[in-house]
């Protein structure tokens, strides 16, 4: 790889975030929140969409299978889109990718809200739905790495963990907004009214807000880091992804493991929890969902807290701390489900939810990749683990919960062990010789 000056890789340390940093963070977080909002409403409304976009004689179960298949195609397309967009982002600029990814999410989301149904156009309806979903997936694969990279190159190096922790918390807020929007629709309207046209509202709303955010992002500047490497003719001329694999394999694999912990923690502690609470504690759907909503809020706080700790302690120590706290809380929660009072379980669950954000220390990893290949490095880290491992957690946890009350604890314990080992390896290999930036 071409030699480049390390001074072009990060911005100098300084105290606090400046006003411009906060503006950048706000626009980055807004885009991320909207993308995950769009992602969630499709997942949650799949049973309804299956009735509208497939023939009635197909049968409800098969229609739902096909709708979820369209949703799953997103997981396959996500790494492809993310890696292509990252390649362009390392060659053409961060700001351009940062804006394009949001535009590619907003337009198909708006289009979904305006699509004709099977009753109107026949087989064209599911084909159009599939096309929208594929474009969405390409966008979401590019958005998160582009946002992490853009923000990391706009804020001082000693604030990168906090900034990307705030950004990752924004993704959790998007999941929360998507869930609350769908719940509100189901509470306010009858099933017939939703099928008659109300289902379009969250898609149109998400699309319009996304286009507004695109317009706002247009006013952001290119990062000073990218401008510096471009002016000094340090842009990588080969295939950035190949250089990531050749020279930064350890960073890539450790980052993939941390991202797995982050995704799997959300799946186990947040997404799979309502069903477990209803089965084991006899909670109503409303009570279980309330725990879930509070859990998502705490996970967002955890992203910010552990992101800041990554600035202070380094990624390695932060990962080890998160793993120990998560395992302790999970052990109390799962083994105390049928014995402890609800107050004690709530406290253990709150700590689990907070620690589900500890994987957000991944945001600090961005500055470990050299600037000319940085976006490709983060896109590979995020998308490869999301594609290979992201869909594994929910079905595995559902199966484990059927085997034993504490079934999901086994998966969490294995994840915590992996997270702690990765933290220890990272600390010894990358952080032992120098103070965390």
How would you describe each model-predicted region?
Residues 316-361:
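C-terminal transmembrane helical hairpin of 12-TM major facilitator-type secondary transporters
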Residues 46-80:
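Extracellular/periplasmic helix-loop-helix junction of adjacent transmembrane segments
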Residues 162-186, 381-393:
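Glycine-rich segments within core transmembrane alpha-helices of 12-TM secondary carriers
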Residues 122-141, 342-357:
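Hydrophobic core of transmembrane alpha-helices in multi-pass small-molecule transporters
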Residues 91-102, 312-323:
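Cytoplasmic membrane-interface "Motif A"-like loop-to-helix N-cap segments
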Residues 213-220, 414-437:
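Multi-pass alpha-helical transporter architecture, strongest
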Residues 43, 249-299, 390:
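Extracytoplasmic gate region of multi-pass secondary transporters
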Residues 103-121, 325-338:
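C-terminal ends and interior cores of transmembrane alpha-helices
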């Amino acid at each position: 790889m071409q030699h480049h000056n390390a001074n072009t890789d990060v911005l100098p340390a300084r105290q606090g975030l400046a006003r411009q940093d906060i503006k950048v963070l706000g626009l980055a977080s807004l885009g991320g929140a909207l993308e995950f909002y769009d992602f969630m409403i499709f997942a949650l409304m799949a049973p309804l969409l299956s009735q509208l976009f497939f023939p009635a004689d197909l049968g409800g179960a098969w229609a739902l299978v096909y709708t979820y298949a369209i949703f799953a195609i997103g997981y396959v397309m996500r790494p492809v889109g993310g890696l292509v967009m990252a390649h362009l982002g390392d060659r053409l600029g961060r700001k351009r990718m940062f804006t394009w990814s949001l535009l590619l999410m907003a337009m198909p989301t708006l289009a979904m809200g305006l699509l004709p149904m099977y009753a109107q156009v026949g087989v064209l309806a599911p084909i159009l739905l599939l096309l929208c979903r594929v474009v969405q997936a390409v966008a979401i694969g590019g958005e998160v790495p582009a946002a992490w990279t853009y923000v990391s190159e706009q804020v001082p190096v000693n604030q990168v963990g906090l900034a990307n922790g705030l950004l990752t918390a924004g993704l959790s807020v998007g999941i929360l907004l998507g869930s609350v929007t769908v719940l509100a629709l189901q509470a306010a309207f009858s099933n017939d009214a939703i099928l008659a046209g109300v289902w379009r509202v969250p898609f149109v709303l998400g699309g319009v807000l996304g286009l507004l955010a695109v317009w706002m992002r247009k006013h952001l500047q290119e990062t000073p880091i990218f401008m510096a490497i471009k002016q000094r003719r340090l842009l990588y001329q080969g295939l950035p992804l190949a250089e990531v694999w050749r020279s930064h394999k350890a960073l890539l694999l450790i980052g993939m493991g941390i991202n797995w912990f982050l995704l799997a923690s959300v799946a186990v502690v947040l997404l799979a929890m309502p069903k477990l609470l209803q089965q084991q504690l006899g909670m109503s759907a409303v009570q279980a969902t309330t725990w879930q909503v509070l859990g998502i809020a705490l996970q967002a706080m955890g992203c910010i807290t552990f992101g800041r700790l990554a600035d202070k302690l380094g990624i390695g120590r932060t990962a080890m701390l998160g793993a120990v706290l998560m395992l302790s809380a999970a052990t109390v929660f799962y083994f105390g489900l049928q014995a402890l009072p609800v107050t004690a379980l709530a406290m253990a669950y709150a700590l689990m939810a907070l620690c589900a954000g500890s994987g957000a220390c991944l945001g600090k990893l961005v500055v470990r990749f050299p600037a000319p290949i940085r976006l490709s490095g983060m896109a590979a880290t995020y998308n490869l683990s999301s594609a290979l491992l992201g869909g594994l957690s929910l079905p595995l946890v559902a199966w484990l919960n059927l085997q034993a009350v504490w079934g999901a604890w086994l998966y969490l314990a294995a994840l915590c062990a992996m997270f702690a080992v990765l933290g220890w390896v990272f600390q010894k290999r990358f952080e032992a010789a120098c103070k965390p930036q």
